[in-house]
Amino acid sequence: MTTSEQSSQPTYGIHLKRDVMIPMRDGVRLATDIYLPCHGDGTVVGHTEKVPALLIRTSYDKTAPEWDDVFPYYVRRGYAFVIQDLRSRFRSEGDGSYFHTANPWEGDDGFDTVEWLAT
């Protein structure tokens, strides 16, 4: 069992970029919130060096309060936490079904998002 001394400790603050509109290959833009670790002086870690990222794509509203207990744990430990509304859901653009099996853009949208984040 891991003790608190062995696990990572929260060392960063949190910087939020709300509703970043990430373009997909067909021109539709998906609303994305990006939480980045920052230093005590407010300098965003992701601007000066690459950080690992956790990506969640949801049809249940990226601003739902349930996420408020999730993202701080990771961001304070140096991860970027990225959460995106699926195509045609909430703040994202596009027409289409939000059911994964019926949405023909789902795979491409996920791929395009990862590629955008990696640049």
Language-model regions: role of each:
Residues C38-A118:
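Cap/lid segment of the alpha/beta-hydrolase catalytic domain
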Residues T3-E49:
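N-terminal cap/lid segment of alpha/beta-hydrolase-fold proteins
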